[in-house]
């Protein structure tokens, strides 16, 4: 039963596999990026994270543990000198995997594995607010403001025309009343009794 046995065999014995990954970790820390197959790159990431975590501790015991893995002393000195400043408070994820394509000989998938520094992450965080701040700048435009002003101007005119239209029927209703008012004085008040007198004189006397 294969319990509590991490890692992949990769078709090699344990000693061959350990020697291969020790060489690969040394090359990765020395050149900061190497190309290998996908399966080896995923396993190499575990080795690199373990070594860098030990280097961030910086004590003597951690240095001796790294010396048992990395083959070159100058690479170990460089790693311990830059680990705390370069990786800072980053907890794991010290490497980046980028798939390149197929290898020409056997069409094996090839991956580029490289170290990630703390400065790259801080630069990305600084660039993000700049993009968001640049978006609201081009929103105000003169033609749009003119269109909005032109669209807003007819509204008061329509509001003014509505009371004017409402006042027109009132004026028209008042006009006939004004015209009808002067017609009443045309009938003189004195004529009515005259007609009554004339009618009484012309009427024949009653016979008994």
UniProtKB/Swiss-Prot annotation:
GO molecular function: structural constituent of ribosome
Ranges of biased composition (kind: Low complexity): 151-179
GO cellular component: cytosolic large ribosomal subunit
Record region (Disordered): 122-208
InterPro entries: Ribosomal_bL17 (IPR000456), Ribosomal_bL17_CS (IPR047859), Ribosomal_bL17_sf (IPR036373)
Pfam families, per the entry: Ribosomal_L17
UniProt keyword Coiled coil, yes or no: no
Protein origin, superkingdom: Bacteria
UniProt entry keywords in alphabetical sequence: Ribonucleoprotein, Ribosomal protein
BP term (GO), one: translation
Known partners and oligomeric status: Part of the 50S ribosomal subunit. Contacts protein L32.
PANTHER family: LARGE RIBOSOMAL SUBUNIT PROTEIN BL17M, RIBOSOMAL PROTEIN L17
Family, similarity comment: Belongs to the bacterial ribosomal protein bL17 family.
This protein's name: Large ribosomal subunit protein bL17
Species of the source: Desulfosudis oleivorans (strain DSM 6200 / JCM 39069 / Hxd3)
Gene: rplQ
